[in-house]
């Protein structure tokens, strides 16, 4: 009995790791041009989006130029998503199973039709678990993040990913692979926490609206995990994607200053040595506007990438759990 439970937990972890990896790689490849443009715009105080697009379009191999840095970006985002979703699921499952936390209201006890099969927690629990999981994943993937940002930038003439890593180590040492981690953590942890909070709340509200509409009234028969049997996969995916877009837009707008500072530190660590100094220098030399460089690009990219990654992830998990449930029923 115990072995079966452990096997189930391992299978669940593999499901979440695989789903996170697949969703992360796909979203990274599709949205690499937007990520590259954001890096180029943020690295300079005079380059506009249209100027940057024109420069890339006029390069010898324009298509390839827009997808420069795709490999490190896909590796970072893919494995970052895999680690993040796996650790986030573990945290949320442990919180959901805690009788103490359930007693004080951290776990939602009210059952309702929902577009997701993931654990239902309070806003505070969603905020905290999202932030903790992202900070941990960010630290593990920081070296790849540094290589990705440097490789995308035109401040460095790196010809390969290996060459970029070698140059960073020789010129800055091991510490160079973690330049800007403070700014990255301060940006990513709150972003992830806010995203999960907004995302789960929006999903809950949209699921309630859809379920309460005349077209789906009376379809309230539920299965385990609070998911309606009659809520079609396409309906769930639409709710999840819409919630993801809105949640990402809100979280991105709030955390963009840290993203702008982080990019400067990672690109020019000798000029911008730490978070506070970089922020003061940017505001003093370029004004408050510099803290919101690339906001439009980042908001657009984050809205699509986060919504896409979470929708694919949730759909893969939903299908995997449905298959697993059918297999268990056949065994019984």
UniProtKB/Swiss-Prot annotation:
Task: Offer one example of a GO biological process linked to this entry.
Answer: heme biosynthetic process
Keyword annotations? Membrane, Mitochondrion, Mitochondrion inner membrane, Repeat, Transmembrane, Transmembrane helix, Transport
The keyword Zinc-finger appears for this protein: no
What this protein catalyses is:
glycine(in) = glycine(out)
Q: Which GO terms describe its molecular function?
A: glycine transmembrane transporter activity
Which PANTHER family does this chain map to?
A: MITOCHONDRIAL GLYCINE TRANSPORTER
Transmembrane residue ranges: 17-42, 69-95, 127-152, 180-203, 239-265, 294-312
Cite the InterPro entries for this sequence.
Hem25/SLC25A38, Mitochondrial_sb/sol_carrier, Mt_carrier_dom_sf
Q: What is the name attached to this protein's record?
A: Mitochondrial glycine transporter
Give the Solcar repeat ranges.
11-94, 121-205, 235-319
Give the location in the cell. Answer: Mitochondrion inner membrane
Presence of keyword Transmembrane? yes
GO CC annotations? mitochondrial inner membrane
Mode of membrane association = Multi-pass membrane protein
Q: Tell me the domain of life.
A: Eukaryota
Q: Can you tell me which family this protein belongs to?
A: Belongs to the mitochondrial carrier (TC 2.A.29) family. SLC25A38 subfamily.
Query: What is the annotated role of this protein in its UniProt record?
Result: Mitochondrial glycine transporter that imports glycine into the mitochondrial matrix. Plays an important role in providing glycine for the first enzymatic step in heme biosynthesis, the condensation of glycine with succinyl-CoA to produce 5-aminolevulinate (ALA) in the mitochondrial matrix.
């Amino acid at each position: 009995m115990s072995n079966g439970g452990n096997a189930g937990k391992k299978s669940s972890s593999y499901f979440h790791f695989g789903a996170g990896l697949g969703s992360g790689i796909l979203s990274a490849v599709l949205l690499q041009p937007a990520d590259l443009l954001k890096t180029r715009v943020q690295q300079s105080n005079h380059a506009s989006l249209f100027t940057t697009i024109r420069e890339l379009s006029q390069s010898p191999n324009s298509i390839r130029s827009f997808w420069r840095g795709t490999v490190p970006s896909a590796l970072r985002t893919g494995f970052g998503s895999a680690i993040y979703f796996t650790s986030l699921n573990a945290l949320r499952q442990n919180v959901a199973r805690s009788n103490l936390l359930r007693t004080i209201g951290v776990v939602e006890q009210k059952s309702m039709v929902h577009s997701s099969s993931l654990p239902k927690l309070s806003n505070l629990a969603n905020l905290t678990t999202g932030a903790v999981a992202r900070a941990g994943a960010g630290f593990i993937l920081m070296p790849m993040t540094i290589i990705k940002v440097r490789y995308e930038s035109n401040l460095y003439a790196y010809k390969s990913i290996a060459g970029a890593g070698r140059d960073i180590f020789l010129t800055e040492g091991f510490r160079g692979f973690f330049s800007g981690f403070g700014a990255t953590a301060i940006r990513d942890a709150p972003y992830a926490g806010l995203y999960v909070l907004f995302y789960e709340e929006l999903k809950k509200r949209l699921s309630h609206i859809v379920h309460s509409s005349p077209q789906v009234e009376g379809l309230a028969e539920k299965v385990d995990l609070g998911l309606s049997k009659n809520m079609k996969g396409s309906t769930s995916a639409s709710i999840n994607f819409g919630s993801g877009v809105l949640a990402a837009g809100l979280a991105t707008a709030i955390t963009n200053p840290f993203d702008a500072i982080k990019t400067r530190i990672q690109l020019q660590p000798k000029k911008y040595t730490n978070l506070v100094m970089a922020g003061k220098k940017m505001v003093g030399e370029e004004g408050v506007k510099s803290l919101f460089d690339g906001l439009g690009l980042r908001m657009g990219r984050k809205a699509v990438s986060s919504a896409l990654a979470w929708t694919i992830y949730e759909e893969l998990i939903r299908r995997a759990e449905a298959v697993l449930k059918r297999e268990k029923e056949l065994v019984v």
